[in-house]
């Protein structure tokens, strides 16, 4: 712990932040199983300190990261598949490859799920990456499947981009973006894409899972963890069950144990497959309201806002006045983006008390934190 504290006092690069976060989550997971409350408090304080410093690090470096690859530029959402998928497919040597994207899967949640897969799979590679801002599905997951920034998608594939102010699902075209990416990468052979948003869809895919065996690469987007975390705002039951991060991890574990996804992994192992497990962004439990003002049609996300005439204290948020520099579309000529940091959430002055009471201690995503941005990429081979 002293070593972690000492490291936090120095200047870390992106790779060192990844390693720091993995070690902190490892200790949190381990200590949540022990009775040592004193040590838990020490790690919790380190964690808060780390998230504060990580937010500063992102504010300082993010523009450089989006400018393009370089020695100290970490892997990010829009470069992930173009750079890593061809390598993984080559290593699979003709075996089926599955890309499993579990929405909202944080590093700590992966750490509790991983042991359940150890009997059937061995880990070939662990290489966490940085989820791009906003750490929200409409941006980060489209960027992942397109292998492009949101600004590039809006320009090159306008039929696949639904802007903030437009009606309709923002992620209805992932399949199309993925197909076009595979064409661009010269990936030959049959490919598949499946999105599971509820239990019935999961069971249906499991029943027909044998059909995926003939594809060279199959993407599976599994939304259930996302439903778990979003449900915290809608269902008091979840609020009771997941009162803190440790309870949230244990809820994730029991969900996974009984989900069709667990059985799909067993099927993949039977196929002798290469399996990639990743996500488009994580999530964080919020507790501190930060007041902002916006026009009536400003987006509803609690961790980022995009719009004209946003009112806020610049010291409270990370502001982006040149969206193009950050790979983001600009809905209007005067549009800016602002991002919440650490455990903050953005609230409007009207009805503020009710709003704060309702959303405090819920899991949200879209902003800047280790939990949202430093996310798993794990490659597994069937034993």
Predicted regions and their residues:
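Feature captures the catalytic ectodomains and active-site-proximal regions of enzymes
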Residues: 1-383
């Amino acid at each position: 712990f002293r070593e972690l504290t000492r490291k936090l006092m120095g200047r870390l690069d992106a790779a060192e932040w990844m390693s720091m976060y993995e070690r902190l989550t490892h200790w949190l997971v381990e200590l949540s199983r022990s009775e040592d409350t004193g040590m838990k408090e020490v790690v919790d304080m380190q964690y808060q300190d780390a998230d504060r410093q990580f937010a500063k690090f992102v504010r300082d470096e993010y523009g450089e990261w989006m400018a393009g690859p370089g020695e100290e530029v970490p892997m990010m959402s829009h470069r992930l598949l173009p750079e890593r998928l061809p390598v993984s497919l080559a290593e699979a040597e003709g075996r089926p490859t599955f890309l499993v994207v579990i929405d909202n899967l944080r590093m700590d949640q992966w750490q509790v799920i991983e042991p359940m897969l150890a009997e059937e799979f061995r880990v070939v590679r662990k290489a966490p990456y940085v989820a791009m801002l906003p750490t929200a599905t409409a941006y980060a997951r489209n960027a992942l499947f397109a292998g492009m920034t949101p600004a590039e998608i809006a320009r090159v594939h306008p039929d696949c981009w639904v802007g903030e102010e437009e009606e309709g699902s923002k992620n209805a075209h992932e399949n199309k973006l993925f197909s076009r990416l595979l064409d661009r990468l010269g990936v030959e052979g049959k490919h598949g894409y499946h999105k599971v948003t509820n239990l019935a869809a999961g069971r249906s895919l499991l029943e027909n899972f044998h059909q995926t065996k003939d594809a060279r690469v199959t993407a599976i987007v599994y939304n259930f963890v996302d439903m778990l975390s979003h449900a915290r705002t809608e269902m008091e039951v979840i609020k009771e069950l997941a009162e803190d991060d440790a309870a949230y991890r244990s809820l994730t574990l029991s969900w996974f144990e009984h989900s069709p996804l667990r059985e799909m992994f067993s099927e993949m192992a039977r196929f002798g497959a290469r399996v990639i497990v990743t996500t488009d962004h994580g999530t964080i439990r919020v507790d501190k309201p930060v007041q902002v003002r916006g026009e009536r049609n400003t987006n509803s996300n609690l961790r980022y806002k995009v719009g004209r005439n946003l009112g806020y204290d610049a010291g409270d948020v990370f502001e982006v006045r040149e969206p193009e520099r950050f790979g983001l579309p600009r809905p209007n000529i005067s549009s800016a983006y602002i991002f919440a940091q650490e455990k903050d959430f953005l609230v409007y002055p009207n009805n503020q008390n009710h709003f704060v009471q309702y959303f405090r201690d819920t899991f949200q995503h879209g902003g800047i934190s280790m939990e949202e941005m430093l996310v798993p990429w794990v490659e597994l081979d069937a034993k």
